[in-house]
Design a protein with these regions (language model features):
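Mid-domain alpha/beta scaffold segments of enzyme catalytic cores
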Residues: 1-230
């Protein structure tokens, strides 16, 4: 509810999503999802998410997320994460709301699950992508999905500046910050904030060999397309 209130306070700047982050999936995940589902139902709206699709968009939220799988710290709730992820993927299919997907040390498991629903998925974002060309190509085999690229791309050790132009067209990227984490250079090590996305833009525009204006225009269009922000 606080997220919705914030989005109403800053219309056109803050947009709400709803979902259970994998790091929050514990033994009580079913209860947590039941509460989120209740909120989702409370915010049904009329109209179509896609004029060419008879499936109605039923929520004030713009996406189901941030959801996914995270096995970096622990696999204690591995099965619970898989089940919670699958349930929320079904929400996305039902509502036609795109997915915002978090995946850490679990791409094989994530892809295996998504393949089961590939023809039904409305699209979304693979958030905070830091993988290689092969991994990027695998994720982009899902139609209407884009890669979210953040501050890691500005790090000296990052291979993204080479791998992305080689494997990912500009119309399959959106810019992110993942605030308050992973601040881009020259703010690395400090608290990240959304305003720092300009540094990601500068880095990727240079990597793709285009102007910052052109890259910004394209990635803004990508955001509007994925989240149906017309």
């Amino acid at each position: 509810h606080a997220v919705l209130a914030l989005s109403r306070e800053y219309p056109g700047y803050a947009y709400p999503m709803i979902g259970l982050h994998p790091e929050e999936v514990k033994a009580d995940w079913k209860d947590q999802l039941a509460e989120l589902r209740k909120i989702l139902e409370e915010h049904r709206i009329t109209g179509n998410a896609n004029p060419a699709d008879d499936s109605p968009r039923i929520s004030d939220f713009i996406a189901i997320g941030e959801i996914g799988l995270d096995y970096y710290w622990s696999r204690e709730f591995e099965q619970e994460q898989l089940e919670a992820f699958e349930e929320q993927v079904k929400w996305s299919i039902e509502t036609r709301l795109p997915l915002m997907i978090h995946c850490r040390k679990a791409q094989n498991e994530m892809v295996h699950l998504l393949r089961q629903y590939q023809k039904e998925l409305p699209g979304g974002v693979f958030h905070c992508f830091t993988g290689n060309q092969k991994e990027a190509e695998e994720l982009l085999s899902f139609d209407n999905f884009v890669l979210g690229i953040g501050g890691v791309s500005t790090f000296k050790s990052s291979h993204l500046r080479e791998d992305l132009p080689a494997a990912v067209p500009m119309n399959r990227i959106i810019l992110e910050t993942d605030s308050p984490y992973m601040a881009p250079v020259p703010y690395r090590g400090k608290r990240n904030e959304s305003a720092f996305v300009i540094e990601v833009l500068k880095t990727l525009a240079k990597a793709y060999g285009v102007s910052e204006e052109e890259f910004a225009e394209q990635t803004n269009k990508n955001v509007e397309s994925v989240f149906q922000l017309n």
